[in-house]
């Protein structure tokens, strides 16, 4: 019952028909989502729910709300005519996009590669809003200290690009959008593979229909998770 309620809450917002910012990063899933829509999997519900609730609390605190509105978890949906994509930034403050992420990582990032998936999405928002500077907010839920103890930690990172770099991002987005539209029109998904952590029988409901080349048929991507191991106390 709780799982069903959570799924209904996460899916309550109507998704506009078209290409969304998240589709740019995983174009094959965008194709399959368009031709064979699927509800959120149980795993996705469990992953998305805590982050969405925390979004409401953090963004509400930024707006100095006395009572947190759980229905407000981003700035709403926008459309970029230039790029032909829909996008929903978490916050636009003083003209700059601020994107909030929650992370279960035990360690803070050492370099940009440790937060590259977050930065990729933020760059798309920057392209859609035609801005050269933004901020990435990350709420780390379990950062370890020197003694191995864990505690939440909030970090903010400035992200800046040159106009030439922004134009390069825009060109990539436009090319990917055109490819997605063409794939949907023809029914032939001649598209780049999704990111590895979004691919596989355990992670993608379309995996057995998509059969991504180089991945399908391999143990790494084919395997399903086994039953969770439950620690049991010894009998006395």
Question: Would you name each region that the model predicts?
Answer:
Residues 26, 125, 204:
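A residue-level signal for conserved active-site and pocket-lining positions in enzyme catalytic cores
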Residues 1-97, 104-110, 116:
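Metal-dependent nuclease catalytic cores that hydrolyze phosphodiester bonds in DNA/RNA
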Residues 84, 111-118, 159-162, 166-169:
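Short capping loops/turns at secondary-structure boundaries
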């Amino acid at each position: 019952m709780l799982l069903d309620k959570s799924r209904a809450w996460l899916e309550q917002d109507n998704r506009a028909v078209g290409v969304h910012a998240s589709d740019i990063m995983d174009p094959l899933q965008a194709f399959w989502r368009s031709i064979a829509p699927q509800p959120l999997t149980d795993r996705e519900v469990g992953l998305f729910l805590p982050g969405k609730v925390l979004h409401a609390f953090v963004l509400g605190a930024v707006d100095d709300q006395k009572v947190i509105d759980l229905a407000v978890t981003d700035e709403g949906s926008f459309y970029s005519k230039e790029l032909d994509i829909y996008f929903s930034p978490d916050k636009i403050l003083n003209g700059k996009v601020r994107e909030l992420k929650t992370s279960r990582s035990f360690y803070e990032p050492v370099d940009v590669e440790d937060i590259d998936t977050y930065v990729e999405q933020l760059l798309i928002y920057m392209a859609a809003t035609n801005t050269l500077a933004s901020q990435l907010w990350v709420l780390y839920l379990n950062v370890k200290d020197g003694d191995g103890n864990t505690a939440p930690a909030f970090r903010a990172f400035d992200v800046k690009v040159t106009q030439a770099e922004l134009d390069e991002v825009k060109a990539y987005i436009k090319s990917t959008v055109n490819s997605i539209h063409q794939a949907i029109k023809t029914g032939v998904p001649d598209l780049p593979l999704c990111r590895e952590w979004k691919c596989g029988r355990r992670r993608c409901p379309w995996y057995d229909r998509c059969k991504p080349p180089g991945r399908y048929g391999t143990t790494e991507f084919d395997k399903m998770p086994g039953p969770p191991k439950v620690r049991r106390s010894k009998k006395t």
